[in-house]
Amino acid sequence: MWFKNLTLYRFNKPFVVETEALETALADFTFSPCSSQDISKFGFSNALGKKGSSLVHSANNRHLICVTKEEKMLPGQVIKEALEEKVALIEDEENRKLAKKEKDALKDEIITSLLPRAFSRRSQTRALILPELEMILVDSSSATKAEELLALLRKALGSLPVIPLSFKAPVESHLTEWLKNGSAPLPFEMQDEAELKSEADEGGIVRFKQQDLKEDEVLAHLATGKQVHKLALHFGQSIALLLQSDASVKRLKFSEEFRAGNDEVGTDDPMARLDADFALMGSELVALMHALVSALGGLEETQD
């Protein structure tokens, strides 16, 4: 349940919905496994996984939701070879070239015949709805997966006025300034990893890892006009993260010491531990968002 990435969105309008109403809305779009002829299925599932019993898990007006996606694995090369074999056979028997429309129909037939025997894979994506911040945090490093979750949530609710998080000034300008100054604003602390890019179309990319970012070798690249597009940070003593210029957060990791705060909870009740972990994570992510917005100079004004 602990989030590992953050793709960030904000509401254009206040999000007002009670847990029960949200649960009811999501119930019409619950996940069901692929049948023999389904190529994929997508829907809401228990927010807390197998141990959970509800599509929405809420605490302190913070709502956790989860989507599950199942996809049949049909290698393109297998389909291509089967199609070529079938086309060659028919063209040889009928002594003519098949039209594109006929080949497309054959391809559909081949896919249909392969689906019942195909392996499938499942993936889950969670999101944290924070009405107090008017934000949604999606636990995904993929903007596409985040948008898929939001699209289904929008379908369930009827509307979902959200936009990607954006700031008054480009994120890279702040990251570059922090690197020049040798420190990030408290409670953030720079670590030993960064990626710098030239703003020129044909410019280069330089990556530093496990290196003192205050060294002249690093700063020399700033003098040539490169800007920082990725920067490793610590948030207090609780979270390590990689902040990117698109305002997304990768490699989010809560420290063992922080997570140990709930070690005495739920030794005999796994659900109690999950509930406590959710409350702990939610509170710290809210604190992280407050600090991030402040450090990056505030959010861009939304247009009504």
UniProtKB/Swiss-Prot annotation:
Keywords: Cytoplasm, DNA recombination. It comes from the Bacteria. It holds the Pfam family RdgC. This is Recombination-associated protein RdgC. GO terms for biological process: DNA recombination; regulation of DNA recombination. The gene is rdgC. InterPro entries: RdgC. It comes from Shewanella putrefaciens (strain CN-32 / ATCC BAA-453). Belongs to the RdgC family. It is found in: Cytoplasm, Nucleoid. One of its GO terms (molecular function) is double-stranded DNA binding. The lineage of its organism: Bacteria, Pseudomonadati, Pseudomonadota, Gammaproteobacteria, Alteromonadales. One of its GO terms (cellular component) is cytoplasm. May be involved in recombination. Coiled coil: none annotated.
